[in-house]
Amino acid sequence: MNPSEMQRKAPPRRRRHRNRAPLTHKMNKMVTSEEQMKLPSTKKAEPPTWAQLKKLTQLATKYLENTKVTQTPESMLLAALMIVSMVSAGVPNSSEETATIENGP
């Protein structure tokens, strides 16, 4: 091998983005109105009752106890969000307690 072959080659340079203006221009053209955001499947929901919130808190506490996770405000919030998302997604659960949140007390 001659010395020129032994030299380490520099990595290829990354290409710089030319002009971001076209992307910005496209985003400016996108108009999202409230009417566009509402889907036919969107339903108006009533605010939860105190009884529903209490039941949700109880279910979240029970879930954290079953999974042996320390009960902190953060873990309670995540457990509550998990329960709400499971109920709204219609995930089947053998527990009748989860259905109580969906249907009310």
UniProtKB/Swiss-Prot annotation:
Q: Name one GO biological process term.
A: protein homooligomerization
A molecular function annotated in GO for this UniProt entry is:
protein homodimerization activity
List the ranges annotated as motif Nuclear localization signal. 13-20
Substituting R14A results in: Total loss of function and dominant negative effect
One GO term of the cellular component aspect?
nucleolus
Which portions of the chain have biased composition (kind: Basic residues)? 10-20
Q: What is the effect of changing L53A?
A: Exclusive nuclear localization
Expressing tissues: Expressed at higher level in placenta, expressed at lower level in several organs and cell lines.
Instruction: State what changing R18A does.
Output: Total loss of function and dominant negative effect
Q: What is the effect of changing R20A?
A: Total loss of function and dominant negative effect
Q: What is the effect of changing L59A?
A: Exclusive nuclear localization
| Intracellular or extracellular location(s) | Cytoplasm; Nucleus, Nucleolus
Keywords per UniProt: Cytoplasm, ERV, mRNA transport, Nucleus, RNA-binding, Transport, Transposable element
Q: Provide the primary localization.
A: cytoplasm
Other noteworthy facts? Despite functional similarity, Rec shares almost no sequence homology with HIV-1 Rev and HTLV-1 Rex. Two proviruses inserted as tandem repeats in most of individuals tested. Both proviral genomes encode identical Rec proteins.
Q: What is this protein called?
A: Endogenous retrovirus group K member 6 Rec protein
Q: Could you tell me which species this protein originates from?
A: Homo sapiens
- The gene behind this protein is ERVK-6
